[in-house]
């Protein structure tokens, strides 16, 4: 579950009396998806966050500053913190030690009745008991009262009473668990990068806490990363702007509380055109925004317009900037902590508390206004950037109209080069974005015209990382894609209007093809990101080689496969190898059989797992700072496959 700023009312009184019991654990193993979302790889990793979040509660309450997560042999997980240790005295209602109640009873925790944590997003103890129920084995060690207490469980059932196993001069809690393979049938193997990304994010969002991740599964190659950011989300913004050119050296930073709502905001403008706004409530990434984002945007637009007019940078009232104009080239993070967060939206990642809007608006507007008046040169640059964005917006409006279709049935306005499919059901429809007209011809002949549409792209599309929306919308290839997809773009984007649920990038297997693929992915990431988040974007995998032996043909997709095939084939009859450099070299039948036929093809689905890394990668590869790109090329040249 989520965690937030915690305030334990009285250190001495944090004991069993404050752990309240609501209900039993029986349902968890029967319907695990209700408690952790799914039993897939994502649900498996969710177990780790349930335990880590409890440790973060302790840290934010001021009782811990170190958390360690270890992936042990056989994919055991160990989470250690140096907090006070879970209470071990007898819980009155259950007549059992509080630590056992927390680990075996659903909705038992220190967040009910006001006696434990004052502010917390999750229900402290819910996570622990759910993890216990879904674990093959779980062990707890509590360092408290100069004593080490220990208890072990199998599938949530205690194997013996809580016992004393030693003395200690430390305090804290250690929980070890192994996920139950009967529940997690897809996998019980943890992904280091998945854990690393969230742990880094938690370290940014909770400044001053040190969180360490260690992987001990391979004794020869133990991997460890430790994260500790005294600057918190200010450091986060600086990292996101690392490959950009900031307009002002230091991010604007505010960290204040009002009406028991803690507000932390960091914002820094750069010379680019993309907006990067990340919002969090009680450490949960609110992908769908919410009232904290609304309050911030409202204050930002109002204050910039007020400053622009009063300082005469903007001449008249009609020159007012829109919200979109004020956010061009802005990197910002909003993090709030609330005692009772209400989450809404399709994925429960939208903050709904109405009182938050006014609090964020008031705190941020006061601070931002003061910053502008104290830094007039930076203020002028930001306002003038907004004015340029407004002009581009007006110019883009006309171009945007060209890409708009009245409805999904408005076939007349579809691009002329598009060979559309006959099905009108988006769930089964796919569109192939094909490099070059000649390959486009082959794919049109070889496709299944009922469900497969083809849009040939001539040449390289515009690098959107270096362009404003008006210029982007004047690019013919981009305009055709927007019209064909039917979703709109930027602020007008509507995923529900997507005409295809598979958008397949199909380029040549050479350097030019890779460049076009990167340009397309940059466009999707910056202007149609929900397509990626919904899992609609794919990359086709055309074969690299055709190996012929007598009448037998083999299509091979990479060098490793080729080496394996060559080692397995008889030397007679003699075989020959042809390398495909372009899609146009294959006829329609070959393209269908190797790359487009759903029965045989291989597609790579584009996923967005680490927003920080994705943003930095696109900026580094496609942005203005040459030095970082040169360094990347030098570091990775050894892995390159060059075509001469």
UniProtKB/Swiss-Prot annotation:
Enzyme Commission number(s): 5.6.2.2
Cofactor: Mg(2+); Mn(2+); Ca(2+)
Residues holding Mg(2+) 2: 508, 510
Location of the protein in the cell: Cytoplasm
Regulation of activity: Pyrazolthiazoles inhibit the ATPase activity of GyrB.
Reactions the enzyme catalyzes: ATP-dependent breakage, passage and rejoining of double-stranded DNA
Molecular function GO terms recorded: ATP binding; DNA binding; DNA negative supercoiling activity; metal ion binding
UniProt domain Toprim: residue ranges: 429-543
CC per GO annotation: chromosome; cytoplasm
UniProt binding sites for Mg(2+) 1: 435, 508
InterPro entries given in the database record: DNA_gyrase_B_C, GyrB, HATPase_C_sf, Ribosomal_Su5_D2-typ_SF, Ribsml_uS5_D2-typ_fold_subgr, Topo_IIA, Topo_IIA-like_dom_sf, Topo_IIA_B
Function: A type II topoisomerase that negatively supercoils closed circular double-stranded (ds) DNA in an ATP-dependent manner to modulate DNA topology and maintain chromosomes in an underwound state. Negative supercoiling favors strand separation, and DNA replication, transcription, recombination and repair, all of which involve strand separation. Also able to catalyze the interconversion of other topological isomers of dsDNA rings, including catenanes and knotted rings. Type II topoisomerases break and join 2 DNA strands simultaneously in an ATP-dependent manner.
Membership in a protein family: Belongs to the type II topoisomerase GyrB family.
Assembly: Heterotetramer, composed of two GyrA and two GyrB chains. In the heterotetramer, GyrA contains the active site tyrosine that forms a transient covalent intermediate with DNA, while GyrB binds cofactors and catalyzes ATP hydrolysis.
Protein's recorded name: DNA gyrase subunit B
């Amino acid at each position: 579950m989520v965690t937030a700023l915690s305030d334990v009312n009285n250190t001495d009184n944090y004991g069993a009396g404050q752990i309240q019991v609501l209900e039993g654990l029986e349902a968890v193993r029967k319907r695990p998806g209700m408690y952790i979302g799914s039993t897939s790889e994502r649900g498996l990793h969710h177990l780790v966050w349930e335990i880590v979040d409890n440790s973060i509660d302790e840290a934010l309450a001021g009782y811990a500053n170190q958390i360690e997560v270890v992936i042990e042999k056989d994919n055991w997980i160990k989470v250690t913190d140096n907090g006070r240790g879970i209470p071990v005295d007898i819980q009155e209602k259950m007549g059992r030690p509080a630590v056992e109640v927390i680990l075996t009873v659903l909705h038992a925790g220190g967040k009910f009745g006001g006696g434990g944590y004052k502010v917390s997003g999750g229900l402290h103890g819910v996570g622990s008991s759910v993890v216990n129920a879904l674990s093959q084995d779980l062990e707890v060690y509590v360092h408290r009262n100069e004593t080490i207490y220990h208890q072990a469980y199998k599938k949530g059932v205690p194997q013996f009473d809580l016992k004393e196993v030693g003395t200690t001069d430390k305090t804290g809690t250690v929980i070890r668990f192994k996920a139950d393979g009967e529940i997690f049938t897809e996998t019980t193997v943890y992904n280091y990068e998945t854990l690393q990304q969230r742990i880094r994010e938690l370290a940014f969002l909770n400044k001053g806490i040190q969180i360490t991740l260690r992987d001990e599964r391979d004794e020869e190659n133990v991997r460890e990363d430790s994260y500790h950011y005294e600057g918190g989300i200010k450091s986060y913004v600086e990292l996101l702007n690392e490959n950009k050119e900031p307009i002002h050296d230091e991010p604007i930073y505010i960290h204040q509380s009002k009406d028991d709502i803690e507000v932390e905001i960091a914002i820094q403008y750069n010379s680019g055109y993309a907006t990067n706004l990340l919002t969090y409530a009680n450490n949960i990434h609110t992908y769908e925004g919410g009232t904290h984002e609304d309050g911030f945007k409202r204050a930002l637009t109002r204050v910039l317009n007020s400053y622009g007019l009063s300082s005469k940078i903007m001449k008249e009232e009609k020159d007012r900037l829109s919200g979109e104009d004020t956010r061009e080239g802005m990197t910002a993070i909003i993090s709030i902590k609330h005692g009772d967060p209400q989450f809404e939206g399709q994925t429960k990642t939208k903050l709904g508390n109405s009182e938050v809007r006014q609090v964020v608006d008031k705190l941020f507007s006061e601070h931002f206004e003061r910053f502008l008046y104290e830094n007039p040169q930076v203020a002028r640059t930001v306002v003038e950037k907004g004015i340029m964005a407004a002009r581009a917006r007006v110019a883009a409006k006309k171009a945007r109209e060209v890409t708009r279709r009245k409805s999904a049935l408005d076939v007349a306005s579809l691009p002329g080069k598009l060979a559309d499919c006959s099905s009108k059901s988006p769930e089964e429809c796919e569109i192939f974005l094909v490099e070059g007209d000649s390959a486009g011809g082959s794919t049109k002949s070889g496709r299944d015209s009922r469900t497969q549409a083809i849009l040939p792209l001539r040449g390289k599309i515009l690098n959107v990382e270096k362009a404003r929306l008006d210029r982007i919308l004047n690019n013919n290839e981009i305009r055709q894609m927007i019209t064909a997809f039917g979703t709109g773009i930027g602020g007008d984007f509507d995923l529900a209007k997507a005409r295809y649920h598979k958008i397949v990038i199909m380029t040549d297997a050479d350097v030019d093809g890779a460049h076009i693929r990167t340009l397309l992915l940059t466009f999707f990431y910056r202007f149609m990101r929900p397509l990626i988040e919904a899992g609609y974007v794919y990359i086709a995998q055309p074969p690299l080689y055709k190996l012929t032996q007598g009448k037998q043909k083999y299509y091979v997709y990479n060098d490793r496969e080729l080496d394996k095939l060559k080692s397995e084939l008889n030397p007679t009859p003699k075989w020959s190898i042809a390398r495909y450099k372009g899609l146009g070299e294959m006829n329609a039948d070959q393209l269908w059989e190797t790359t487009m036929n759903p029965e045989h093809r291989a597609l790579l689905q584009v996923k967005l797992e680490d927003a920080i890394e994705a943003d930095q990668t696109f900026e580094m590869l496609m942005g203005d700072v040459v030095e970082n790109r040169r360094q990347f090329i030098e570091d990775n040249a050894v892995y390159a496959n060059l075509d001469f």
